[in-house]
């Protein structure tokens, strides 16, 4: 991506040298040992990546809530600047899209942190991956997740990283359009299988919205050769079917909450090819 020199967002808060603080409360996270711990790590990491708050899984003995202060490396500075630029591009993209709808886009906040931080949805921890909190309209990210994408998920490249931010912003768009609260209401009295199916549709729509952002980047000449493949690879790398096969050796479709690799690929591509949020209605057609 040709992102250097572009506008940075004014909606970024940097907490990387701040303590989580005693007001966060609650227990810390202790990963179980053995295969169960590995499975839980993958589940929480990927759920956080797609905006699902799994803080309730964080049980065990309390851990220190104090983050040590250390210097920020040049690579981390570069990642922070990149993240701020990407957020700014989503602001421009959705500002234009909402104007076409006759609406005003309310920009989300983004918080960069290390380890753990307070959020409107409870304690945020880096083990959760990036996530969006609808209660405070904020995207949270520990920038070390970019390394996790490369080393643990096999999804490398700046456009793949931008896709992460654009997906979380997609959840913010769902909130503004009234989609997220309606889905949460439907899930309250639904069976677990139906809760999961609704979650899949939410996540695929956020993928499609990320594709709409990607289309805007292409139209502006920001993308370089290979960028689209980076994002599509990221979408495929974290499909429920692939992750379940890797972590437990079998696939359980009724337990899917994010969609298959092919579904993620297809819905991102739909948004990317059309540039039209109206093409992202995952609730009105077969997925």
Curated annotation (Swiss-Prot):
Topology within the bilayer: Single-pass membrane protein
Secretion signal, residue range per the UniProt entry: none
Keyword Membrane: yes
Cellular compartments annotated: Membrane
Biased composition (Basic and acidic residues): 1-17
An example Gene Ontology CC term for this record: membrane
Keyword annotations of the record: Membrane, Transmembrane, Transmembrane helix
Main location: membrane
Stretches for region Disordered: 1-29
Name listed for the protein in its UniProt record: Uncharacterized protein YpfJ
Organism: Escherichia coli (strain K12)
């Amino acid at each position: 991506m040709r992102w250097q020199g572009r506008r940075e967002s004014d909606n970024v808060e940097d907490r990387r040298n701040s303590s989580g603080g005693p007001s966060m409360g609650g227990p810390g996270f202790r990963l179980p040992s053995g295969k169960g711990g590995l499975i839980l790590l993958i589940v929480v990491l990927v759920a956080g990546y797609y905006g699902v708050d799994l803080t309730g899984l964080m049980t065990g003995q309390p851990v220190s809530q104090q983050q040590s202060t250390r210097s920020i490396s040049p690579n981390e500075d570069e990642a922070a600047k990149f993240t701020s630029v990407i957020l700014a591009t989503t602001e421009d993209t959705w500002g234009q899209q909402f104007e076409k709808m006759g609406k005003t886009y309310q920009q989300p906040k983004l918080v960069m942190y290390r380890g753990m931080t307070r959020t409107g949805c409870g304690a945020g921890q880096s083990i959760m991956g990036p996530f969006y909190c609808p209660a405070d309209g904020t995207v949270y990210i520990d920038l070390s997740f970019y390394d996790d994408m490369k080393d643990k998920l096999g999804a490398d490249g700046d456009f793949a990283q931008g896709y992460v931010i654009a997906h979380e912003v997609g959840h913010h768009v769902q909130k503004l359009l009234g989609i997220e609260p309606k889905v949460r209401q439907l899930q309250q009295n639904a069976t677990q299988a139906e809760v999961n199916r609704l979650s899949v549709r939410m996540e695929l729509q956020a993928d499609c919205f990320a594709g709409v952002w990607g289309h805007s980047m292409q139209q502006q000449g920001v993308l370089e050769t290979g960028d689209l493949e980076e994002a599509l690879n990221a979408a495929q790398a974290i499909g429920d079917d692939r992750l379940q096969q890797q972590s437990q050796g079998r696939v359980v479709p009724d337990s899917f909450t994010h969609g298959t690799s092919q579904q993620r690929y297809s819905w991102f591509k739909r948004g990317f090819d059309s540039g039209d949020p109206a093409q992202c209605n995952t609730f009105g057609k077969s997925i």
